Amino acid sequence: MRLIRYDRDYSRRHFLKSGGLAVAGVLAPLWKVVARDGNVIAAYPDELLSIEGYTRGKISSGDEITAANVELVKELLEPVKYQQVAALGRRLRVVPTTTDIMRLSPWEYIEATLRNRGQARFDERGNVITADGKPWIGGNPFPDAASAIELFAGQTLSWGRHDASFYAIKEQEISPEGVVQFQYESGWAEMSPVARIRIDPKPYWPGRQDKLRFQSIFYQTPDSVKGTAFLNVWPYDQHQFPELYGYIPEFKRIRQFPTDQRFEPLIPGSTLYLSDAWAAGDPLYTWGNYRIVGRGPMLSAVSGGWNAEHPNWEHATHGGPKGKTFWDTQVELVPEAIVVEAEPVMFARAPVSKKRVWFDARTALPLAMVSYDRRGDVYRSFDGAYALYESGGKTFMDGAHPYWSWTHVHCFDSQTGRMTRLEQVRSVSGGHATSVNDGTVYDRYLTTAALMRLGSA
């Protein structure tokens, strides 16, 4: 008979006692353990490191969570995902918990986080700077986050955790009846001129230290939106809105758009807003009243989401009225998630009253987001899946290490029943292929000239 030193009640008491503090780890401070061991095992009791231990054998790795057994793990799911499993036919395949920290974010990002740990602070305007007053230099500035604002600051600084990314994306819009009403192919590009850890010059791109990121999205199919493109240029000052430029093929010119209209879909049928990106799609201080409202274990898709068996990395679907509403998804027991709420403070016409984001305490990665309408009712949800891109003997490389990134996303409108599904694929029409830390992404995708070129191609 195996003796259990720390049961679920011990963990619950710890999380309740922690209250509004964000410092992670149950048995020991998490990032002290990570710096020493490279994994998280010594920071958590066994019962938080396996679904078998947590459910006392009622659910095991390899099992599927369905409407028949979801009540056993209801407390481990955000409310919208629970309802999707309980009522809409969503299924979740359980896999073992990942404890190696290097498999949960890009390798160099974790190295930079460890190397630069303890050097970040906020300046008088609340922007993240180094101890000597310069823009941030790379990695998560607050791995030992002690507050909600530190968690969100780290995520806002670096969405994809690479210096540059180009994501080839396929997107489907699903009606409440389960019908695929729209299908899009697009490209999403990001580049950081500060906090660079891979692309020279680093950590800063000279002359652009006043910018946080360049980000664009353009559409390749269908013909009704082909050539439509948008470019966001983010100031480093997180009180300022990005500059938003767009190219609309019908007008054959670049125009500048109001940048505070971030709660509207860019294309017909979509439930995805600019504000949703990485659960931190707006400048940090356009939201406020950040607060930690909960913490505890969670089931989330932080590994195994890459479909290496498909030549274009495309994923299978299930559930809903026609079996097309949800991506097939693998989830694992995340030993500790920190739940943060925030309210929009610089959006006079925002349709949301607040958002709630679940962060993986190990990496400060956003696991899920639920927003609430002005009445306080559940409105929309956003949940993603991540992976190290190695599976079944196949690997997609990022320099010396396997690529780490998101793999697929659900964006669901709980009030209308509409679903937007996105997946990162190998390539889309026009020869645009997923790439990482490629310095040419700026000239190809992140200038107004690039938008015009893409729009007329």
Task: List each model region and its residues.
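Short glycine/serine/proline-enriched coil/turn segments at secondary-structure junctions
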Residues: 224-225, 237-238, 332, 347-351, ...
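Extended beta-strand-rich segments in extracellular/periplasmic secretory proteins, especially
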Residues: 113, 117, 186-208, 215-221, ...
